[in-house]
Every structure is written in C-alpha cells, then in structure tokens.
Amino acid sequence: EKTPVAYTNVSKQEMEVRLASQDIPMALNTTPSVYATQQGGGAGDARINVRGFNQRNVAVMINGVPQNDMENGWVYWSNWDGVGDATQSIQMQRGLSAVNLATPSIGGTMNIITDPAAMSRGGSLKQEAGSGTFLKTSFNYNTGLIADKFAFSTTLVKKTGEGIIDKAWTDAYAYYFGSSYQMNDANRFELYAIGAPQRHGQNLYKQNITTYSQELAGEIEGYDVTSNSSGEKFETEAGRTFNQNWGAVDPSYTGKQYWYMYGARTVERHDPNFLNERENFFHKPLVNLNHYLTLSDAMRLSSVLYWSGGSGGGTGTYGSVSRAPAIPDNAWYASSP
C-alpha cells in the first residue's frame, strides 16, 4: 500500500508471536521509533512512546474511535485488556497525519482494527499459564464471510494472577462482539461492542536503584551510594519484585474496601490478608457503528457513530501514612511501628 507517511502495519500473525498475554503496546516494540514498556508491572499499566512523545501525544483509536482520555490525553490500556485477542491488525503511523481528531497526534496515530470480514471461519479455545499464578482463558469464534455479505466475530477472555511484582495482581474479564455487512459494492456497515471489566493492583512509585539491587547500583559509573539515604538507609535490598504500594491487614479485620462502580460504594478486598494502596478498577464499554461509502476509485467516506460509557476509579492514600522500616525477612512497610 502506497502512502507518503511513515507507516507500519502489524498483522494478526505478528501479534500472536510478539504479544502473547502482554498489553497491546508491547506488540509494537520492534516498530521503528516506537518504545513501549509495562512500567511497574501492573496489568494494563503499559505506556507507549512514539518518536519520543508519550501517549498523550499519540492518537490511539480502536476501529476508528479515539481512546485518549478527554481530560489529559492519557490511554488506560487496562480498559482494553483482552482486545489484543480480537485484533486483526494494528496500523501505526509515525508523525503528524491528516486524521481529524481533537487529540494531539504529533507523535503519531495508532489504529487497532478488528475486522470480522477479514477473519477465517473457525473457533478456538486457548488456555495460558505463566509466572505469578497467571491464568488466562480465551474463547474466539468467527463465522468468516457468509454469502459475501455478512460476518460475525466474538472473543471472550478471563484473566487472573497474583503477578510477578509483589501484589500486582489482576482479576479481569474482556468481551468483544463484531459484525460486518456488505450492503453493496459501495456501502459497508460494521457494528462493534467491546469492554473489559477489571481490577488490578498497581506498582506506581519510583525507587532508588539500590532498593532493587545494591550490586547493580555499584556497577553504574558515577552513582552516589549516599543517595540512598532519604530519611532511612536500607541495609537490605528488596529485589526486582519489590512494590511498596501495599500493606498487611490483621486477619481479624473483616471490613470491605471502598470503591465506586455502578453505584456500589464498597467491595470485598481482593485478599483478606493485605490491602493495596494503589488499585485500579474500571469498566469502559464501547459500542460503535461504522459506515464506509465508496464514492469513486479515488474517494471514500468513513463515518463513525459511537457510545462510550464507564464506571470505576482507583485507590490512593489521603493524608499521612505510617510505615515500618525495612527489616530483613519481614514484609516491607507491612505494619506500623
């Protein structure tokens, strides 16, 4: 396909090899001028940079529908956990484009495409297991193109795990329904419904490198070992899986955790033995109707009508927090002195 812009298309086959069960941005790490990271290791907490610009300056779309936050431009990939299993291809355009979106796209434009008509007929049931008690079950079925007119595709996902990073657990579902109808040579309609109700523990705070590995810190040229002294100097190292965003809870405590989703004010804690300082919970369903009109060999009109709701939020500290010093063979910040 000829285009005057820097453009890369990641196919379904490439995604299956690169992505596995990671967040969608991780499939683009081999694309020129693209850097993606899973950050602290929380499920869905990935971010992507294009041409040096973070995702606030990258227009991200799913089937032509913009997904950047309307307030700050950020993209919360946990809202689309499981969409990668239904994706047919990802179009990654680097640099400014002619896309008419309110989202600043100086970094580039990313369009995640789930085209039912391009899927072959068949279905699959996939079971994945990994480190950190990770377990993911995926079901997919595609009708293929029926009578050269109609196609339907569905994907259902359930994912759980305690996480490799301490207490970066996940408990998520995902659903996708897509249909396509070719009315005639000039008109095609597509209808989609996507969502991923989920909650997961987060690891968001940066740490001094000595916290993870004193040996590695000592190998870094110019590293000031005294910089680890910020009120208290850790005499032990926590290791790469360290996460300070949680604390132990007395087993006798049976209270629920505050949250807000669809009117519910409280919820059972993920684990009765600990509480996450930073936890994300959200469900952002998306329904859209696309119409593609071919006016001529050189002109096509694309129209998208969509609805996107959502409910959820995240936890965090308010006021002061008591922390215990780092003690060998004891949980970090596990209880107050």
Predicted regions and their residues:
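Structural signature of outer-membrane beta-barrel domains
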Residues: Q55, Q67, D115, G130-G132, ...
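Transmembrane beta-barrel wall of Gram-negative outer-membrane proteins
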Residues: G122, A129-T160, I165-L204, T211-A248, ...
